[in-house]
Amino acid sequence: MADQLTEEQIAEFKEAFSLFDKDGDGTITTKELGTVMRSLGQNPTEAELQDMINEVDADGNGTIDFPEFLTMMARKMKDTDSEEEIREAFRVFDKDGNGFISAAELRHVMTNLGEKLTDEEVDEMIREADIDGDGQVNYEEFVTMMMSK
């Protein structure tokens, strides 16, 4: 499962993992898991967290090592990219419902999520996803971006 992650994703997960592995012993506690997941843009419920922990905490000691964490994140990412969830996410960003995400709409949603981005950062995000170069993101471009993350 974890072998389907890109090197960039693995590096991101390692960075997040080590931020919460306070004593550097290579494991994180179950309490810290929710914080790690949220830092990576996931938003699991308490029940989902408990399920994930139970699935990967093989020895039942309440801690998760990095290989277990990678497996869990790979599973979680695969699950969250269903077409219906991507469509819902697109609708959240496409405030006026015109089928496009503008820089203003992107900035609005990111600000509501607590991400304070500069205009340059927002423009860069649009540029990265904007395949046809029209300055906004349509549904196909959004799907492509979501599937490649």
Swiss-Prot record:
Family per record: Belongs to the calmodulin family.
Extra information: This protein has four functional calcium-binding sites.
InterPro entries: CALM/Myosin/TropC-like, EF-hand-dom_pair, EF_Hand_1_Ca_BS, EF_hand_dom
EF-hand domain segment(s): 8-43, 44-79, 81-116, 117-149
Residues binding Ca(2+) 2, per UniProt: D57, D59, N61, T63, E68
Binding-site residues, Ca(2+) 3: D94, D96, N98, E105
Keywords, alphabetical: Acetylation, Calcium, Metal-binding, Methylation, Repeat
Modified residues (N6,N6,N6-trimethyllysine): K116
Record keyword ATP-binding present: no
Function: Calmodulin mediates the control of a large number of enzymes, ion channels and other proteins by Ca(2+). Among the enzymes to be stimulated by the calmodulin-Ca(2+) complex are a number of protein kinases and phosphatases.
Positions of post-translational N-acetylalanine modification: A2
Protein name: Calmodulin
